[in-house]
């Protein structure tokens, strides 16, 4: 306890806790993200992680053990009544996706899977049963996000990308700068891991073990796939676009963002204003940024006086994102204010496509993002359509129809079956 008075969201959540009306959250997925959610939820007043769905109950038990120190809170439930009883008893039900998304006691479902197919099936089912959906599954958002948002509107519930990941953290800066009337020149993230387009899980087992990560998930970051997905999510929520296929990804440090990610006419690398991009320069990761332009002499004068920069371009930088740890705040805001943190526009302006990591033969089965077949590659929607590129979120489990050479984009004629 401290002498700090609760204000705003913390105050409102504490009131719900006192009234016995916590925001009840069900989590689909019990991996690293699910474990973070259970742990963070335990620390929050007015928020209750009350159910986890998984095909591997032992991983949900491990998540609960990490959060609480033992498994006393865990209750496995294979019936609807059993799950309801577990929640009413103040325990965390370990159950199936279907039982979780249809349970009447759950207010918000968080998709923590990273699998687009899960979103297509169970996130929609959750909304059909009156649940709000918070998406940590950014791969699904860039594949079917506009559809899920449309269905949420139709069903009278809320669909939102979760707080804490780079897209929603960057959105905070974009909204801040836009509300102040600045022109958004570029927005994006610093890349956390060294970029290796050829990365495969077998090469990263040791590092993944050391970092308590799934090797496939680590490779999704290393080969650039995650960055492509995240920047596409920002594009499709704002209308900002990739300047070139795959974006520039310059080596621009924090102090150089407003010199590099600006139009070429002013010494930068961009052909236009209003783009998403990422940087591998020092001091930006694990944060996000927005580069803006001011034109009024008074604003430029004050920015100089405030040591923001000489102008007319300025970089605003959020030096952190807390990933899974921030996501319960989205669920709380939905329940308390009825507002999402981030939603896709009705029509996407960018697509995440796939580029072969190795030569692929006809008849091979496409594996998952972060494995050995392909990496993600973001381009403008019209470029994707012209190339007949397959959205990366649709590839897993499909068949290679024609030979694909390493470095080639996967087109509709090549896969799926």
Segments (PLM) and residue ranges:
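Short acidic, glycine/serine/threonine-rich loops at helix termini
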Residues: 64-65, 145-148, 171-176, 189, ...
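Rossmann-like NAD(P)H-binding beta-loop-alpha module
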Residues: 152-156, 160-226
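Short gly/pro/ser/thr-enriched loop/turn and capping motifs at secondary-structure boundaries
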Residues: 58-59, 140-145, 149, 166-170, ...
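N-terminal glycine-/serine-/threonine-rich beta1-alpha1-beta2 phosphate-ribose binding loop
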Residues: 1-123
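C-terminal catalytic/substrate-binding lobe primarily of soluble NAD(P)-dependent oxidoreductases
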Residues: 3-14, 206-207, 211-417
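Short, ordered loop/turn segments at secondary-structure junctions
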Residues: 30, 55, 114-115, 131, ...
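Rossmann-fold NAD(P)-binding glycine/threonine-rich loop
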Residues: 113, 117-129, 136-158, 162-164
């Amino acid at each position: 306890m401290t002498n700090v008075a609760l204000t705003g969201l913390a105050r409102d959540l504490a009131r719900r806790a006192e009234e016995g009306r916590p925001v009840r959250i069900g989590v689909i997925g019990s991996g690293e993200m699910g474990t973070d959610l259970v742990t963070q939820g335990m620390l929050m007043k007015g928020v209750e992680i009350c159910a986890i769905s998984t095909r591997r109950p032992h991983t949900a038990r491990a998540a609960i053990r990490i959060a609480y120190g033992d498994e006393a809170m865990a209750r496995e439930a294979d019936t609807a009544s059993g799950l309801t009883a577990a929640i009413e008893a103040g325990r965390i039900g370990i159950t199936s996706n279907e039982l979780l998304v249809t349970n009447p006691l759950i207010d918000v479902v968080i998709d923590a899977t990273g699998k687009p197919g899960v979103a297509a099936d169970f996130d929609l089912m959750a909304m059909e049963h009156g649940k709000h959906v918070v998406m940590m599954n950014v791969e699904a958002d860039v594949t079917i996000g506009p559809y899920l948002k449309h269905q949420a509107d139709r069903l009278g519930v809320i669909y939102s990308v979760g707080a804490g990941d780079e897209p929603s953290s960057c959105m905070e800066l974009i909204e801040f700068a836009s509300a102040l009337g600045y022109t958004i020149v570029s927005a994006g993230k610093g890349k956390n891991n060294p970029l290796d387009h050829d990365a495969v899980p077998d090469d990263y087992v040791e590092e993944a073990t050391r970092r308590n990560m799934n090797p496939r998930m680590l490779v999704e970051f290393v080969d650039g796939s995650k960055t492509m997905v995240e920047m596409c999510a920002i594009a499709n929520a704002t209308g900002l676009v990739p300047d070139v296929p795959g974006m520039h990804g310059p080596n621009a440090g924090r102090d150089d963002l407003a010199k590099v990610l600006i139009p070429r006419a002013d010494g930068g690398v961009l052909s236009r204003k209003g783009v998403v991009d990422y940087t591998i320069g020092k001091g930006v990761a694990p944060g996000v940024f927005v580069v803006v332009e001011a034109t009024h002499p008074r604003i430029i004068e004050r920015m100089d006086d405030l040591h923001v920069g000489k102008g007319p371009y300025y970089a605003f930088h959020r030096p952190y994102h807390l990933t899974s740890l921030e996501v319960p705040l989205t669920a709380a805001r939905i329940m308390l204010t009825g507002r999402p943190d981030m939603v896709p526009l009705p029509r996407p302006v960018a697509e995440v496509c796939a580029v072969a990591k190795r030569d692929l033969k006809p008849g091979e089965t496409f594996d998952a993002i972060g494995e050995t077949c392909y990496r993600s590659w973001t381009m403008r929607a019209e470029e994707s359509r012209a190339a007949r590129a397959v959205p990366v979120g649709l590839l897993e489990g499909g068949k290679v129809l024609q030979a694909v050479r390493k470095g080639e984009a996967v087109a509709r004629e090549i896969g799926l079956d």
